[in-house]
């Protein structure tokens, strides 16, 4: 009887242990799924790029040719530029520059105009996403200094204006955005050629932005005493510039520009930036957008593998032939303009058309340019209830600008 009882106890103990193991495993599985979901939502483009790269490996097994897919020059330059700009931002260069410019500006409309133009012009040098990371929070601070009615009027409009300004300003230079940097290197163009190609679009965009600001200002509610209103109080007091860091990053930036101009090889700035950060400014290493670099690598693998699948390669080449710009515009609406540039460049050598198409393609949907998501996140953080209204203003404005850019494209072709 005791043996039977002991056997029964042992049975229930085994069942309990199995159940406990199943529960723990299930919980671990759920935690893992939750982590994957959070990562996917946070890094959607990277996640999709990795999935596509892995799927393509079923058709083209990994081999030594995979290394030929990677454009190490573009990756090296992108890393250097992100590290240098992050360093300059951490030093406080952009805050000080903006403060000095705003000190010479009077009136609400003047301040709004300056905040938009800062995004437009500085995006040409510090990239569109860094311009938005720097100046959208500043715009939100300043808007909150305005009388409530006036602040509510400008809040969503100025962020939409800044986003469009950063995307359209960045298209003028090779270092303004990642797709320009990649396609410029791929095409073997000179900086002057790219600037000449995109100048009509940037000039038109600037005129449209200034008109938009004036039209919006004319419709703004008139509130007494709504001028500058101590706007500069939004700036936190910063310690003095670290001149060593400033000088070092400016020298490194100059070396990067020489690399962009193909005067020196990319390995030189890459080694110098790494040595300087490791020896003098290690915390800056964490400020680099490694997810963007990983996205590039995954897409290089995906595109390289597609190029080795004859059926797909010939199909995409037929679709692109003579329609490179419009295809790039449409592809950007779905997958964003950087992945579109990487994908389509593997199946055509008409890089000039892709440069125009992916830059115009940065307008339109919220994901057409990943930089646009930065502004959206700031609005969501400001007030989640404003997301829908902002999306409406942003999308309508983007479509209007895209129509003008496409009209200009058909006129110039």
Predicted regions and their residues:
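Intrinsically disordered, low-complexity non-transmembrane regions of multi-pass membrane transporters
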Residues: 21, 25-46, 52-55, 217-251
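Transmembrane helical segments that form the transport core of multi-pass membrane transport proteins
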Residues: 69, 91, 95-98, 251-349
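Membrane-interfacial loop-to-helix junctions in multi-pass transporters
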Residues: 72-74, 103-116, 146-158, 243-247, ...
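Membrane-interface alpha-helices at helix entry/exit sites of multi-pass transporters
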Residues: 109-114, 148-161, 191-198, 351-359, ...
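Hydrophobic transmembrane alpha-helices that form the pore/transport pathway of multi-pass ion
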Residues: 121-171, 182, 342-355, 384, ...
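Cytoplasmic-side transmembrane-helix entry/capping segments in multi-pass membrane proteins
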Residues: 102, 108-109, 157-161, 289-298
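Juxtamembrane and boundary regions of transmembrane helices in multi-pass small-molecule transporters
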Residues: 33, 192-238, 373-413
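Structural signal for alpha-helical transmembrane segments and their membrane-water exit/capping regions
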Residues: 36-65, 77-92, 216-218, 255-283, ...
């Amino acid at each position: 009887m005791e043996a039977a009882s002991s056997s029964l106890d042992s049975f229930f103990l085994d069942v309990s242990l199995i159940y406990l193991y199943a529960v723990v495993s299930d919980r671990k599985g759920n935690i893992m799924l939750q982590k994957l979901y959070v990562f996917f939502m946070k890094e959607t483009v990277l996640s999709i790029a990795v999935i596509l790269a892995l799927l393509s490996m079923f058709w083209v097994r990994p081999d030594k040719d995979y290394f030929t897919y990677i454009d190490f020059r573009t990756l090296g330059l992108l890393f250097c530029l992100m590290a240098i700009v992050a360093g300059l931002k951490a030093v406080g260069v952009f805050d000080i520059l903006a403060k000095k410019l705003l000190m010479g500006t009077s009136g609400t409309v003047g301040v709004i105009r300056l905040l938009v133009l800062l995004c437009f012009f500085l995006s040409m040098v510090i990239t569109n996403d860094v311009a938005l990371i720097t100046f959208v929070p500043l715009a939100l601070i300043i808007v909150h200094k305005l009388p409530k009615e006036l602040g509510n009027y400008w809040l969503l409009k100025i962020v939409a204006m800044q986003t469009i300004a950063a995307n359209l300003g960045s298209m003028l230079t090779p270092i303004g955005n990642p797709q320009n940097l990649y396609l410029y290197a791929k095409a073997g163009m000179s900086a002057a050629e790219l600037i000449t190609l995109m100048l009509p679009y940037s000039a038109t965009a600037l005129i449209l932005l200034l008109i938009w600001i004036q039209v919006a200002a004319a419709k703004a509610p008139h509130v007494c005493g709504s001028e500058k209103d101590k706007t500069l109080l939004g700036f936190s007091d910063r310690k003095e510039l670290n001149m060593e860091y400033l000088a070092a990053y400016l020298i490194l930036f100059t070396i990067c520009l020489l690399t962009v101009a193909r005067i020196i090889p990319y390995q030189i700035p890459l080694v110098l930036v790494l040595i300087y950060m490791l020896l003098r400014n290690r915390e800056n290493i964490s400020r680099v957008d490694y997810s963007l670099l990983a996205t590039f690598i995954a897409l290089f693998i995906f595109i390289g593998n597609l190029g080795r699948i004859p059926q797909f390669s010939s199909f995409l080449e037929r679709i692109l032939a003579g329609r490179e710009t419009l295809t790039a515009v449409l592809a950007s609406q779905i997958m964003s303009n950087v992945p579109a540039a990487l994908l389509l460049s593997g199946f055509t050598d008409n890089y000039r058309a892709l440069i125009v198409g992916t830059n115009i393609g940065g307008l339109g949907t919220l994901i057409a340019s990943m930089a646009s998501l930065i502004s959206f996140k700031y609005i969501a953080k400001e007030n989640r209830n404003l997301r829908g209204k902002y999306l409406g203003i942003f999308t309508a404005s983007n479509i209007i600008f895209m129509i003008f850019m496409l009209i200009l494209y058909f006129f110039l072709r």
